[in-house]
Amino acid sequence: QRFTPGACALGFALYLDELERLSAPLPPVQQQGTERQWLNIALPKGRLGDKAYGLLAAAGYEANENYNETRKLVVENPEAGVRYFLVKPSDVAIYVEHGAADIGIVGKDILTESGADVYELLDTGMGKCRMCVAGPRNFVDDESRALRVATKFVNIARAHYESIGRDIDIIKLNGSIELAPILGLSDVIVDIVETGTTLKENNLTVLEEFMPISARFIANKASYKFKYAQLTELLNKM
């Protein structure tokens, strides 16, 4: 009766092609224990990434193909042991935090807003601007009610107003933040200000500056420990 239709069954299968694939040696750049490991660098697409790459290239970490002309998302220099990932600026800290990249270059605004658990190694001084509270020129804060704040930097705005004990209602927007107080959607905005030209053209003004912004070198915590020599060598050349 052990072999009747109602009996339980146990079986297994071997996929020889899969076993062969898994047992094959890794390409040289992926092998562990080699003399020089890859240093994976996340660069933001756009002007900031171009400037950062220029600094790295000048320090001897230029990619083997034209960085400005390639459409590839990964470029590398095997001789220098570096590999560049080109990602959205808002994703740099995510790649670094989770170990897909060892280091990255990211704006302080994005880094603070994301709350990524990474090491901040160096202020590059690139992309300088300010995180500000801005509003109408004649704005007077009515402390008897919650302040309506429009911003895309929700965590930064909340932390700032918590630090001064001010109740707020946050209105999350993704663009054209300056429009919110003009249309009465918010009392003020929290946003990055570089020159202030857009504010002036819309009859708004900076009411408070509370965070300097610039591009920072960040590192994955495990990578900082296990690739310390490579990281410090790169930073010392910058």
Which residues does each PLM region occupy?
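Domain-level signature for soluble enzymes in the chorismate/prephenate branch of the shikimate pathway
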Residues: 35-238
